[in-house]
Amino acid sequence: MKLIKAIIRPNKLEEVKDALTRLSISGMTVSEVRGHGRQKGHKAIYRGTEYSVTLLPKIMIELVLPDEVVDETIKTIIETARTGEIGDGRVFVLPIDHGYNIRTGERDMV
């Protein structure tokens, strides 16, 4: 099992969710996050005053999946979320040993 963490642009969330649904992936956690990489923020003007926005809004999608669907899932996320511009996001893959169902206390197999 793997934990996939995809950090994407907020305006790409619905497209990515739809693409994952077409892969029959239904379980996911979606969080609003802030951060920056190479993009390093931007300048904004509010009521005539310029200020720096250094932490940009992003969406983080987390999925726990069997190993055999990880590569196709990553490919789908990248193809769907990509605009070709700096700030498109990142995908991280981490190993998962096991999980537990909180309601039943049973050890889960994804």
Where do the model's predicted regions map?
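Positively charged, small/polar-rich N-terminal and surface patches that mediate targeting and assembly
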Residues: M1-V110
